[in-house]
Amino acid sequence: LYLFAGGHDHVGTVRDLFAISGSQPLLPRFALGNWWSRYHRYDEAEYLTLMDRFEAEGVPLSVAVVDMDWHLTDIDPGYGSGWTGYTWNRELFPDPAAFQAELHRRGLAVTLNVHPAEGVRAFEEAYEPMCRALGRAPSGSPIAFDVTDRAFMDAYFGVLHRGLEKLGTDFWWVDWQSGPYSRTAGMDPLWVLNQGHYDDSAARMERGLTFSRYAGPGSHRYPVGFSGDALITWRSLAFQPQFTAAGANIGYGWWSHDIGGHLDGFRDDVLATRWVQFGVFSPITRLHSSSSRFSGKEPWRFSQPGQRSMIEHLRLRHRMLPYLNAMNLHAHRDGRSLVEPVYYQDHSPQAYRYLDEYLFGSQLLVAPIVVPNDPVVARGHADVWLPSGRWTDIVTGRSYRGGRSHRMWRDLMSIPVLLRAGGFLPLVAEGESLDARELFPELEVLVAAGADGRFELDEETADDQWQTTVLELSATEGRLTITRPDRDRSGRVEWTLTLLGLASRSGARFE
């Protein structure tokens, strides 16, 4: 039993946890972009047509999720349910390898949904190879799922999943729903699956990745976490910001929520828009919905101005990739989650009461709007406590004094996203590539005036190394300095600096 008692030193306390349990690993950069996910019986043509539409709308995606209908689901009842499956439905996807290769060509990583509980049954293409691997005759009897059986688990990864990965699957959405029970007391199948899938992924890719439910303390070592299923209600949205920030207290920083909600609830374009705005400023941005014809989260399904707001925010998520990936390294190296409660920085009593807001990396404070619009003014509001100093909204350019609370009203085009005085927000330049895997030779950096500041922009290079560019603002001298590494491998040829919080906005261009 460990007891961590750090008083108000929340950061130090979590670092103590990491000292004995290991830190959060680095995510692949593509995981930080926009994910498309829907529980829907797609076929290949419909899925690729949908990807065409996202591209035509200028909405960048980096992960393509294919829910459980990729595999056979309408099976002989004598085998059990169609919930578990490992054989592609070739009526829907005639050539799985070509389908996934086309998604890869478009810059998308691919993840497939699996429910492992019913094991491997005789109708599966992998049944006989699994039997051979386990030294048993293919009698038609099911191969039981058993996390306590080392031989089964070796074949589970080395035969069952490896065969599918050879067709192009990058990582797995492990949708375990069958409880914490196994043949060995205390051995939770979810924990074994999370560790196993992450470690197996890390052996195949430069950085591991799985996508599964939280299995208890220590789960931060096996990102990403799946929090679904979310109800489509304001109450459900209102719960997610404080739930996400609180995850930092146990080092669990990489939550993926059902952005927009999954099921039940009601249709509300304002709710959907506010949810996407929160999703863009959450650890993982994964649009998701059920198979209902009325619940899809394609932005063009919604009325204006919500549609325009969703598209602009999803573009902003992609533009934030340089910042997000720097915070990815920050989380791994320095023991900080991307989303943290404001009381990590400000220990005043108010910081412990305003739980709908949070720190988003080292530079931003975000206050999602989680209530309906006031019908009189057609705006929603967030009650925000600001730590000391000055804070500037990156959309409106308005500055606020810290050390006090504010009620901030916004129309449907934005939520309060505040950059600390002396803060820096690096963004992909407008018009740059929509591919999250690529390097970005042009950056725009938002800089908030009002205080001295320093930001270390950690970036990956073409040879998969990290380099650091230091940005410094001297408010007293009116000087902004960019110190590039001695051997700059970023390929960057242009910077655009946009100053916020001045009497009038101004920009400077550096070649």
Predicted regions and their residues:
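Accessory, solvent-exposed terminal regions and/or long lumenal/extracellular loops of proteins
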Residues: 414-510
